[in-house]
């Protein structure tokens, strides 16, 4: 098994979106709408603007792992003087390839991208399965996070 890691390009976008939908289903999300058009629009726009980056893992021509980092900016604060934040998403590894270090490698690559972008912090809403990976990397729970659904 020779795994290749590369940046996501528009050529792989449809396959990447399929993996994202599979990830959401696996995490128990309810499918109430067709997300494909919205995801495609989001990724195309933000990849073009440089505010979304992704590394993918391939076994031959088969995409077996994904990662994603969206970059956002908010007013600077003491904990993040740049105001730049990374929002980690789309971390997915095909079940047959789990526990082989693939997610760890993908995560390290998007974290490097966040550093290069100037992010002072990275946030993620972690699945149960991913908590150990993120904790091992140094992510900590933030008790202050709240959300208001519109």
Predicted regions, residues:
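A short beta-loop-alpha structural element at the N-terminal edge
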Residues: 4-18
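Conserved beta-strand in the GNAT
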Residues: 56, 62-71, 87, 92
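Conserved acetyl-CoA binding element of GNAT-fold acetyltransferases
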Residues: 79-95, 144-147
